[in-house]
Amino acid sequence: MSPQNNHLQRPPAAVLYADELAKLKQNDNAPCPPGWQLSLPAARAFILGDSAQNISRKVVISPSAVERMLVTLATGRGLMLVGEPGTAKSLLSELLATAISGDAWLTIQGGASTTEDQIKYGWNYALLINHGPSTEALVPAPLYQGMRDGKIVRFEEITRTPLEVQDCLLGMLSDRVMTVPELTGEASQLYAREGFNIIATANTRDRGVNEMSAALKRRFDFETVFPIMDFAQELELVASASARLLAHSGIPHKVPDAVLELLVRTFRDLRANGEKKTSMDTLTAIMSTAEAVNVAHAVGVRA
């Protein structure tokens, strides 16, 4: 990581793993899908790790699930990652976009206030008023940029976006074309270049979400991201992630192993009991691995 990026609170994957990406691209002899930076085997190695090439594992997930996701994107289908909050859906979408496009900067954050111009395009109103609609006055949003440049676009928490705004994706996912009715001639039609696709994420258990239309659902392949089932893997992840956060916070020590083990066991027990119909109060928070990492970080800072 270059010196100017040392003080970033959270460096993007393209910056954090730039050396690994360069190494994989240099050693990649397999054919790449059109518009991709890496082949499918190299993209898999980037996400799941490869000890032979000294590539780190970046997420705990089934290898078969990653392979299905890569095949979905390679065949031009949109990918929808669904699951409970805190299951690393956003991290996984960032890693997939970085492996395919070289970066994951084209991101739409869904929310109740998200509008269509934040997804597709807007206008520089000074130029629009003085010179009328033109390509110079058009301000491209992430979806426009992704189609123009042939890159992956991430749509985080798509179900938090109003239904009528979600459906603006239909034409881009099916016909791979965006119509700009304000312009004339060739500029009024933007055709997607090779490499363009959409990775969306949605929470299955959360408040303030909207149902997706059946038409939009048909244009995505759905992949469920499950919580980490293996205790040892979850403990290792919490330990490594909390240690990295503590080092970033300038804390010289780590959380003791016994404390981490108790923390992870408590979270797992609460998750298991929360799914049962018992007399205990219903949990109002998702006891996810990400939340366990946050608690471990706070414990380390407080100690």
Regions found by a protein language model. Give the residues of each.
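Conserved AAA+ ATPase small/helical "lid" subdomain
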Residues: P63, S242-A303
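AAA+ P-loop NTPase catalytic core and its hallmark functional loops
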Residues: S2-G250
